[in-house]
């Protein structure tokens, strides 16, 4: 079922789309899905050129698809837009309002939707740069560990991002709590992209907490392949 036909019927019959058909069965435009996936997996690293490319993707979505998307997809787009605004140091007033609107609902949940995880990731990001206080940081950090669905690759990818967001903010003494879960995820998915991140945080734990030079050196042996993101996460983090 095409989205345009459903919207037409909804208007003629004066019924919400969700009352006509199961929202999950709506045919989402392939081009939109392509743009969405790129936005979710893209990183700007503060580079203006990368930010510009992502902004062009958002422009295309808002011009061609947004008004015809299901509500859940519209929310997803809005959260991704806010995330880019935060990364690029733009006006985040709307973003903080959006976060406030949905965040307290999320705190009451025991299971998280994909959009919930996006908003949680946004919250941790805002905490990291001082846009949000950390009132719920510890509570949410622990709850996230209880929710890991290894069968859903898209959510697992988001959980990896969330774990990184937690690790760059928790006390060094707590690193292994989160790297243990991170290891389980990488082993279950066979996706070792973030393995250098795990080794980096563990090496810092062994050096600063256990003061075990042998363990530190052994762990650091795995770091020659560390990527720029991993290096920034570890060495730009304030020593505590």
PLM feature spans:
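Short intrinsically disordered, low-complexity coil segments enriched in acidic
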Residues: 1-9, 109, 240
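TPR-adjacent "capping" and linker segments in tetratricopeptide-repeat scaffold/adaptor proteins
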Residues: 21-34
């Amino acid at each position: 079922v095409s989205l345009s036909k459903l919207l037409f019927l909804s208007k003629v019959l004066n019924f919400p789309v969700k009352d006509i058909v199961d929202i999950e069965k709506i045919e989402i435009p392939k081009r939109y899905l392509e743009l969405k996936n790129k936005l979710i997996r893209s990183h700007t690293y503060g580079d203006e050129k990368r930010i510009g490319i992502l902004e062009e993707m958002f422009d295309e979505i808002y011009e061609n698809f947004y008004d015809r998307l299901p509500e859940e997809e519209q929310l997803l787009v809005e959260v991704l837009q806010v995330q880019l605004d935060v990364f690029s140091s733009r006006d985040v007033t709307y973003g903080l309002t959006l976060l406030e609107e949905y965040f307290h609902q999320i705190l009451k949940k025991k299971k998280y939707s994909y959009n919930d995880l996006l908003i949680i990731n946004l919250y941790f990001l805002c905490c990291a740069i001082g846009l949000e206080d950390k009132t719920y940081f510890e509570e949410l950090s622990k709850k996230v560990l209880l929710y890991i669905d290894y069968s859903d690759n898209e959510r697992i990818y988001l959980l990896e991002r969330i774990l990184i967001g937690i690790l760059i903010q928790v006390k060094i003494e707590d690193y292994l709590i989160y790297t243990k879960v991170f290891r389980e995820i990488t082993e279950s998915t066979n996706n070792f992209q973030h393995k250098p991140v795990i080794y980096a945080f563990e090496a810092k734990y062994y050096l600063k907490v256990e003061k075990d030079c042998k363990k530190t050196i052994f762990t650091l042996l795995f770091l020659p392949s560390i990527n720029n993101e991993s290096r920034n996460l570890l060495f730009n983090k304030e020593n505590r």
